[in-house]
Amino acid sequence: MNKTDLANVAKQIFTVEAEELIKASARIPSDVVKAADLIQNHDGKVVVCGLGKSGLIAQKIVATFCSTGTQAVFLHAAEALHGDLGIYHPGDPTILISKSGSTDEILRLVPILREFQSPLIGIIGNSNSRLAEKVDIVLDASVSREADPLGIVPTSSTTLTLAV
């Protein structure tokens, strides 16, 4: 690939990601306000949970919360099912991140988190998913396409999840 082709691919990636962000800005503002109110009006910490690429995004969200003075911790969805739930206090809000909304490990966590009376916020790429039905607030992170020319790498979806 020559430099001109590479520059065109880069421009296309930026364009697709920007388009997806603009589309999302029209559909989620009121839900973002609900989620922000929930987090802001809670005295404890926020737990952010994901797996795979969503887990990496969750870690970045935790870092941002901590930078702004909001206590937050990352919980790996698979590790949570194997003894890492000791971080919870009753009522700690939890943000569950899943592109598909059908991640088994996260779905298995929901009833356990309900026992902790944890309000659940989902940042979900499929608002018609099983996870979307189970959380209190859905932040719709769906994208019509990824910026990756092959459509297999989560590019637009991860950018949108960070923006939410």
Task: Put a short name on every predicted segment.
Residues 44-163:
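Glycine-rich phosphate-binding loops that contact phosphosugars or nucleotide phosphates
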Residues 2-41:
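An N-terminal, well-structured beta->alpha segment
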